[in-house]
């Protein structure tokens, strides 16, 4: 029997909570358990002060109430059992045989056809404790079964929250205790141990056999009070009993916090760009319907960021919060693991996390039923949704920034595969048909949030050409239209695909692997909007191609960019970094062909090879010219600010502080872009592998190509000096910059290694700049390869400046460190 329930039926001989008159001034007060605790304290298993509203509910902004049935000790009387059985049998009768009329809420909802059941948010009736399914995301509306979870009694655990918080220095105005997350409690894995080469989704802590956390073992009901951000409603049943609402709100605010006041740029290091609109997520009237797994992963990403230390929580609390959100995210994603559902059901008894939820499972386990995407033998997993792809990106980004980089590829491959299954590389059809419907790419029945409905079969289908559904812009539609596929949803799909496109080229450069997402399958998709138009909601699908989406309202205005594009036009990752990654993809193809065991020997030095190299050089020159134009255009902050925000007739001149912030952002982008151009020049004609570069068995250092790369290496160091001026902590794009900094430093290391004391001061100063940048990267995103390379570079510079060392020993150690990261035919790059 749990402590809260035993408190309800407390014997009357418990000592009173009053002071005994002993005559001493320091008499210790004796407490007795309250016989009645409010619902919130009862569910969180903490002491209630019995003053309604109690102090805990007041601090947490939770409605304090007592609605559960009072229980007494002993066995239930037989007459009571008979009455309960009769009530259950009556409730299980068909609707047609009941004499009573349906409730107003039931009468308002019409009959639901098979394959298109309605879905609602979690809610719990105080009398019945019935929990309904959560609101699925935009793409999860197909064939969802209505689920009713039986109430579950949480396992008995020893609550050490009071003692734990007593040891932490938390101010009285900070967050309320994290109930049920005491030291050594709960089924949550240690966040730094689960990367240890194991499958994260299959992780199960042995300590979870005897204890279950309320947030995962059952789906407690959110309080009746209105949420500050209604978008969080699907995930609140999992968080209500473990995290205070104020903390959840602050983490969501941190996720959408911008590093600049002029443009939206993520401040969290694990967020590379915004594929979701801030205004749509934080809206109180029509929030974007999102899956619980996506919401949990967003909170996890925010909690992992260093800026979470600014929140009034202690480091031990933050660590436990990250552990909780990690376990919750992976648990909610578990149905998307590519295993048989039959095997998963058979393993329910042995899996404590699965057993805690039960065979019916939370609503997220039935978003993708087998009847739609599986086969008759249970060998094909569910399709998934756009929200699941974004969740995979969050999880994979977190693992990639850890030491277990190779383990992240399974998550990236899952994101790539699911994105291809959902056909994110294709323009979504406004009116999908049975034959041309992309599997899992669009919703097909009602949404549960106001203003976001299912698919409309309205007058947007081109009946004159039934073989090709209409792709035209639907910017005249609003969220208030029932069944509307909005332009926002179409743009989310594009931005998700292009983010994966960037990540694929980045990972291929890091891990010396071929490309997974090809240019050929991306050429029909419009490039992302600029960040200002996207965040302001000014979205149009207006392609310059005649066979692409057309916008009847815009006409020849608002023409979108198409692939391929080698122009720098925006401050966002999609604006200046996507063209460079397109060129990087061609360099990766060239390097893979050069390292091919048979193809490389036949093509190296031939005319087709030289023609390909010349084409890449042309693209780089085109980008450099656009970068100069961008710098000149961006010198006037009035133009971009008017595009980032809706113009006003009486718009005032830009404030000096805002103009300075815009100029600072522009110079940061130009510095990074200039450095990346020089690195791509080095990768085009130079060697990627540091050991082969130092050994120089083919005498490449005597070729004209080596002389041309030296100037780019020095110019790259000069660009890094500018980067350190505008972005001292390398926080603008730390995830992408590490490998670029490494490849740009290999040539300088080679020169210092060869020349030793004869190296000029310019070379040594360039090396010092690279070392300072590497040290900043280590502070921002601490990874082992950067720490190792910093030591190698520092020892080489110190040796060149005259420090006495054992040359043979130091060279052997230096080569041993560099041999860990190879870009040869069999090398795996940074993936150890």
Swiss-Prot record:
An example of a Gene Ontology cellular component annotation for this protein is: nucleus
Highest rank taxon of the organism: Eukaryota
Could you tell me which residues belong to the region Disordered?
Answer: 1-28, 84-157
Instruction: Supply the PROSITE patterns for this chain.
Output: ZN2_CY6_FUNGAL_1, ZN2_CY6_FUNGAL_2
Q: Name one GO molecular function term.
A: zinc ion binding
Keywords carried by this UniProt record: DNA-binding, Metal-binding, Nucleus, Transcription, Transcription regulation, Zinc
- Output compositional bias ranges, type Polar residues: 126-135
* Chief localisation class: nucleus
> Per the record, a Pfam family?
Fungal_trans
Q: Where is this protein found?
A: Nucleus
In which residue ranges is the amino acid composition biased (Low complexity)?
Answer: 15-25, 100-119
Q: Which GO terms describe its biological process?
A: DNA-templated transcription; positive regulation of metabolic process
What is the documented disruption phenotype for this protein? Reduces growth on L-arabinose, xylitol, arabinan, Arabic gum, arabinogalactan and apple pectin, and shows poor growth on L-arabitol.
Summarize which parts of the chain are annotated to bind DNA, as ranges: 38-64
Summarize the protein's role: Transcriptional activator of the arabinanolytic system. Involved in the regulation of extracellular arabinanolytic genes and in the regulation of the intracellular activities of L-arabinose catabolic genes in the pentose catabolic pathway (PCP) in response to the presence of L-arabinose.
Which family does this protein fall into? Answer: Belongs to the xlnR/xlr1 family. araR subfamily.
**Record protein name field:** Arabinanolytic transcriptional activator araR
The species this protein was found in? Aspergillus niger (strain ATCC MYA-4892 / CBS 513.88 / FGSC A1513)
The record's gene field reads araR
């Amino acid at each position: 029997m749990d402590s809260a329930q035993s408190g309800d039926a407390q014997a009357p001989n418990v000592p009173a909570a009053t002071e005994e008159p002993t005559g001493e001034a320091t008499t210790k007060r004796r407490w007795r358990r309250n016989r009645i605790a409010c619902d919130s304290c009862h569910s969180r298993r903490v002491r209630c002060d019995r003053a309604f509203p109690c102090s805990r509910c007041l601090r947490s902004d939770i409605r304090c109430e007592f609605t559960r049935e009072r229980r007494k000790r002993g066995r239930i009387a037989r007459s009571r059992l008979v009455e309960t059985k009769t009530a259950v049998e009556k409730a299980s009768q068909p609707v047609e045989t009941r004499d009573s009329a349906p409730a107003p809420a039931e009468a308002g909802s019409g009959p639901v056809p098979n394959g298109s059941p309605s879905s609602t948010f979690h809610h719990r009736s105080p009398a019945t404790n019935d929990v309904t399914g959560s609101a699925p995301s935009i793409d999860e509306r197909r064939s969802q079964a209505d689920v009713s979870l039986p109430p579950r009694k949480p396992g008995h655990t020893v609550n050490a929250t009071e003692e734990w918080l007593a040891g932490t220095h938390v101010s009285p105005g900070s967050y309320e205790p994290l109930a049920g997350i005491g030291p050594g409690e709960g089924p949550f894995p240690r966040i730094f141990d689960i990367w240890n080469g194991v499958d994260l989704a299959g992780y199960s802590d042995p300590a979870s056999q005897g204890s279950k956390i309320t947030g995962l073992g059952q789906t407690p009901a959110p309080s009746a009070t209105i949420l500050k951000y209604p978008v969080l409603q699907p995930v609140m049943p999992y968080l209500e009993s473990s995290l205070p609402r104020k903390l959840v709100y602050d983490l969501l605010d941190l996720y959408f916090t911008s590093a600049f006041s002029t443009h939206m740029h993520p401040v969290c290091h694990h967020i590379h760009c915004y594929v979701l609109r801030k205004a749509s997520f934080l809206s109180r009237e029509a929030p974007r319907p999102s899956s619980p797994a996506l919401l949990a992963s967003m909170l996890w990403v925010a909690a992992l960021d260093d800026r979470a230390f600014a929140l009034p929580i202690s480091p031990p609390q933050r660590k436990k919060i990250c552990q909780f959100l990690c376990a919750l995210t992976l648990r909610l994603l578990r149905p998307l693991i590519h295993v048989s559902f039959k095997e998963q059901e058979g393993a329910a008894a042995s899996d404590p996390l699965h057993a805690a939820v039960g065979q019916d499972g939370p609503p997220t386990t039935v978003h993708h039923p087998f009847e739609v995407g599986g086969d008759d033998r249970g060998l094909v997993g569910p399709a998934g949704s756009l929200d699941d792809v974004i969740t995979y990106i969050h999880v994979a980004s977190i693992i990639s920034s850890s030491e277990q980089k190779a383990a992240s590829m399974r998550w990236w491959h899952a994101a790539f595969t699911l994105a291809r299954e959902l056909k994110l590389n294709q323009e979504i059809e406004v009116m999908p048909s049975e034959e041309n419907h992309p599997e899992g790419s669009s919703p097909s029945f009602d949404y549960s949030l106001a203003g976001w409905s299912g698919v409309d079969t309205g007058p947007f289908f081109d009946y004159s050409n039934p073989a090709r559904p209409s792709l035209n812009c639907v910017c005249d539609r609003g969220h208030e239209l029932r069944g509307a596929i909005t332009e926002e949803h179409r743009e989310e799909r594009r931005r998700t695909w292009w983010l994966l496109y960037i990540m694929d080229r980045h990972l291929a450069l890091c891990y010396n692997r071929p490309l997974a997402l090809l240019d050929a399958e991306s050429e029909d998709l419009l490039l992302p909007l600029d960040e200002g138009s996207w965040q302001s909601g000014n979205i149009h699908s207006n392609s310059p191609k005649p066979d692409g989406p057309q916008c009847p309202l815009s006409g020849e205005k608002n023409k979108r960019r198409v692939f391929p594009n080698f122009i720098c036009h925006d401050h966002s990752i999609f604006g200046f970094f996507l063209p460079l990654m397109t060129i990087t993809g061609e360099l990766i193809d060239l390097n893979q062909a050069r390292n091919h065991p048979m193809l490389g020997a036949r093509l190296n030095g031939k005319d087709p090879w030289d023609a390909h190299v010349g084409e890449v050089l042309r693209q780089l020159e085109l980008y450099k010219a656009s970068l100069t134009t961008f710098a000149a255009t961006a010198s006037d902050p009035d133009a971009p600010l008017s595009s980032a925000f809706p113009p006003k007739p009486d718009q005032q001149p830009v404030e000096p502080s805002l103009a300075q912030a815009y100029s600072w952002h522009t110079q940061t982008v130009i510095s990074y872009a200039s450095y990346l151009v020089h690195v791509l020049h080095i990768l085009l004609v130079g060697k990627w592998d540091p050991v082969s570069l130092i050994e120089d068995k083919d005498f490449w250092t005597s070729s004209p190509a080596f002389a041309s790369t030296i100037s780019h290496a020095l110019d790259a160091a000069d660009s890094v000096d500018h980067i350190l001026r505008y972005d001292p902590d390398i926080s603008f794009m730390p995830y992408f910059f590490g490998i670029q900094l490494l490849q740009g430093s290999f040539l300088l290391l080679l020169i210092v290694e060869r020349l030793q004391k004869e190296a000029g001061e310019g070379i040594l100063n360039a090396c010092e700049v690279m070392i300072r940048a590497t040290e900043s990267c280590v502070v921002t995103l601490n990874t082992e390869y950067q720490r190792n390379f910093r030591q190698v570079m520092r020892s080489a510079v110190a040796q060149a400046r005259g420090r006495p060392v054992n040359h043979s020993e130091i060279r052997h150690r230096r080569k041993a460190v560099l041999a860990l990261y190879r870009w040869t035919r069999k090398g795996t790059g940074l993936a150890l």
